[in-house]
Each structure stands twice: as structure tokens, then as C-alpha cells.
Amino acid sequence: MNRLGRLPLPLPPSVCLFCQSRATTPLPPSLQATRSMATARLRRRVARMTLSPDVAKPSVVKKTRGDKERFGPFAGMNQTEARIRDKPRTRSRAAQKRSGEPEEDSQKESPLYKALKMQTALAPIPYGRRAAIKAKIADITSFDQFQLLPVVRNSISSQALPGLVDVTPTPIQRLAIPRLLEEPKTEKKPTKADDDEPQYDQYLLAAETGSGKTLAYLLPVVDAVKREEARDKELEKKEQEEKAREREEKLKNRAFDIEPEIPPLSNAGRPRAIILVPTSELVAQVGVKVKALSHTVKYRSGMISSNLTPRRIKNTLFHPDGIDILVATPHLLASIAKTEPYVLSRVSHLVLDEADSLLDRSFAPTTTEIISKAAPSLRKLILCSATIPRSLDNLLRKRYPDIKRLTTPNLHAIPRRVQLGVVDIEKDPYRGNRSLACADVIWSIGKAGDAESEGPYASYVAPKTKKILVFVNEREEADEVAQFLRSKGIDAQSLSRDSDARKQEEILAEFTEAPPPPTPDEILLAQKQRRHEDAIPFEMPQKTNQDSSRRLANTKVLVTTDLASRGIDTLAVKTVILYHVPHTTIDFIHRLGRLGRMGKRGRGVVLVGKKDRKDVVKEVREGMFRGQALI
């Protein structure tokens, strides 16, 4: 109370009553959902799961003024163009659409590849550049046009590509072999400013699956190894002559004061070239090709992986006669390099096969460590892959800005000779049973006749066994699907990281080695046996088998994960079934890339369910039909 005995009046509140009541009242659910949807942002896909848009674009960095940079008080001096603040702005696309006017300098976007662009899984290379590359390599039609050593050139048809009548280089081989055979004109002298920059040449080989990338880098590497071996022999001969002269002079001057000779450094465990691959299965496959060329070219090669015993790895790498070309996995080679630092002291050529995997998060630290240790003697770094993700492209532009990019016209495309079919598992008779749909497709393919003729002696040769690959997304489902297929009378096996190493080699051998054509002796024996059966007047007793009607004959199925989707040369496979829709178009390319190799035809089948992206499958199928890159 004041002096007059009255109560003071309350002060007016700083916030009105309407605002106070509005703050205490919660928003209705419909408005809350609207507000949350309005503030939500679309998340960008991970860079390692999306392909780069500018694979063939050179790494040229242009300095541009940032949008947030403000002009100072003296920014108007020495200007050739006036910056008028009230300059009329161009109308936005939304305003033009509302007014019904056509957009300026823009073309109507085709609805094709809409879903793939939303995923940003594949990215384009301009088709003008593709046409220029085609015109550039059109004149190269034979391996004789390459500046290879005669012994290397003669070994291509006999060792690298046996059994082929028409031996012609593929597009990536026409691009890569001449560039990789080039010798550096002048060697770089390291300066203080260029200490961090690599002093070796870098190459990126980007080509579609099954295009012969292995032979594209292997032939120049073998050629360089043989040339370097010849140079070393000449230098060694000169050094021995000089040492002999010095020894004679010392003997004349000081007959009793002779210094002990220093033994030369052994070449054991010091390869000239190293090929790194991500898996032990690829080590075996690439190692066989390297070994085949060594029979005629004469060099020492070896392969090491975790599937081999320590004694065999030691005998292969540290052979007293030395080693020229080594095929290995990064983790095993890095562990050996920690205890034996001289392993990487003589490497002149380093190849990263499946570079998108070797420079991913799991392999990047180990691979980078190997490159840095081999850098003092390294002359050429070669990276090759069928898919170039954005993460790899950004890494190359940052770390190797001067890398030479050799890309083929059909990069990020699936060959047109591969047909893609779609099976909706939600319809009758499957009703959502994906395993039942897979078994039904395999039975249909197994019962159907082979489209390719076996030649004039087809009736005298045993029927060809059909090989089918089934890809699943999860490792645990490989065994489950294989067990279900076996219960339906299908000869199915599973292959994953959980499988035994020896079992993996045996299984892959059945699906990677194509059976050779029948020899004349086999044809004559089959003819003789058939004439003998036709001459018997009565019917021969046949083997009775109760389950013969429930078994699918002449068909073998391999249920696997992405373990067999990269680099495995599955020449014997003509059919691939995608049990699940792949997560990205990168997986689409690698899984369907097991087909159409060496110019052969193939067929792919995708099982599509209720929750799968049917729009992505549709656009991939249309892109394959058009023969375009999956953009």
C-alpha cells in the first residue's frame, strides 16, 4: 500500500493476452506435420555410393568469386564494367511456368532416367566426347600397331587370348596401351614447392565391365619390365668392367692392402611391378594371366593372398632368383612391408585394379601407405575400374590433379547384347514368395533349349551344362536361398565370405572356366558309341531313378553376394538372376557385368517385389535397350 492507503495498480504485461494464450496452446497435429515437412531437407546420398559426373573431365581448378564475398569501399576503382544495383534480374523458372512462357536457353528434360537422377547413382560423360574417342581409336585394328616388344606381341594370341581366331584390341586397349608405353620425356626434379606433389605419372583406366582392362595394363607393364631388365643388364656389365679396372689398378699400387668386396644387393623380395586387387579370388584370376604370359616372355611372377600358407608366401616373394611382377592384396603386402622395408624399394609400376574398392574407406589407408612407400622408385601409377564414384573422383582431383584420364565411349553402360527381364513376385503364383519365384525362373531356363548351336557335331556331344549366378544383398541369405533351391531339385551352391577358402576356388573354377570345344578324338568316340547303341536290336536298360523327374539336369546355380560381382571373369555364365534389386546402379553395373564378356550374349532377370524401386529397374532396362550410359 502507498501513503494514501491504496493498492498500486498492476503494470500492463509486456506480451499481449492473445500471444500468451497462443504460446500455451499446442499446435494441432496437422499443422505440426506441415511444419516438419516444410523444414525437412533432402539428404544427399553418400559419395562412395554414387558415380562421378565428370570422369573424363581434366582436373582444372578455376578461381571464382564466392557468393558471400562483399565488395569493399574501393571496389569500384579500375573497373571496366559497371555494377548497377537496380539491374533487372532474370525471371525464375517458377515465375515463367506460372506465366506460361517458355524457358529461355533451356531444353525440356526427358522423363528418362528421372529416378536415377534422384539417386545420383550414375553420372554422364558428354556424348560429344564419346564420339571423339570413337573416332580417335577407329584406326587401330591390330596389336601390331602398338610399339610392343616382338616377344610380347607374339605372346598375345598364344598365351593371353588362346583359342580366338580374330584377335583385335578392345576400345580400352586401343586407348591405354599406346599411352602406357610412352616414356616420360624429361624426368622431374623435385623442388621445395613440389615436395608434396607426386613425381611419377598417373593414369586412370575407366571402361565398362568385360572390356579387357586387365590385358590393357598388363601388356605395357610386362613390356616395361623386359625393357628395364635389358637396361639393368647393360648397366651391370659396364659396372663389372669398371670394377675390374679399378681392382687391377689397386693391385698394382697396393698389392697387400686389398679392401673386402661388398656383395651386391639381392633382388629377392624386390619386385619391379606390383598389381593390387581387393580380394583373394581376384589375386588367383589375375595371377593366372600374369603367369601365362611368363611362359613365353620369360620373367618371374608370383601371387600372394591370405588363402596361401606362410611358407608358400615366403618362397614366392623371397625366391633367390628374385621376382619381377607380384599380384597381392593391400593388407597382406602392407604387413610384409612393415617387417621387410625393401619390398617396395624397386617398384617402378604400381597397378590398382578395382580402384574404387581399393581407395574406399576400408582399403584407403593401407593403399595410400603402399603408394607413399613405393613413391621414391615409382614411375607409373595405374588405376582402373568399371565404375567411378564421386568419392573416388574427388579424391583423384585433390591428390592427383595431373592424372591422365583414359575413358571409353561405353563407360557406365551395360552392353546391348545383355537382355534384362523383370519378374513381379507379387503376382500369382508367387504371391510375394521371392525364393519360389527364383526357383521357377531357374527351372524355366533349365528346361529351355540353348539358343547357341553346338555346330555340326552337336548330336554326338553331351549336352552343355548351364551356369546361372544368383546375387543376393545379404550374406546370411546366400545359404538360405541355396538350401531352398536344393529342396526344389536344383544343383545350387552358396559362395560368401563365410565359405571355406578351398571350396571357394573349386566353386569359382566351375563358373569361370569355359569348357573347350570337343576334340576330333572325342567326336569320333561319341560317333562310335552312338552307332553301337543304334545297332542293338533291343532297347537297352536305362538307369532307374525315382527322383529323376524332380531334379533339374544340366544346370548349376551359384548363389553369391557382391564377392563375385567385381572383376571375376565368368565366361561360362550366360544368365544372372538378381534375387534383390541392387541398392545402387553401381551394383547393377557390376552384377550384370558378369554377362556379355568377350562379345558373348547374356540374359539378366530381376525379381521385383512390393517395396522395391520399380521405376529404377524400368529406367535401367530402357537404358540397356538404348545402349546408353545409366545416367
Swiss-Prot record:
A motif (DEAD box) lies at residues 353-356. Keywords: ATP-binding, Helicase, Hydrolase, Mitochondrion, Nucleotide-binding, RNA-binding, Transit peptide. CDD domains: SF2_C_DEAD (cd18787). Its EC number is 3.6.4.13. Residues 98-108, 180-193 have a biased composition (Basic and acidic residues). Residues 455-631 form the Helicase C-terminal domain. The keyword Cell membrane does not apply. Residues 194-406 form the Helicase ATP-binding domain. A motif (Q motif) lies at residues 141-174. SMART domains: DEXDc, HELICc. Residues 1-45 form a transit peptide. ATP-binding RNA helicase involved in mitochondrial RNA metabolism. Required for maintenance of mitochondrial DNA. The Q motif is unique to and characteristic of the DEAD box family of RNA helicases and controls ATP binding and hydrolysis. This is ATP-dependent RNA helicase mrh4, mitochondrial.
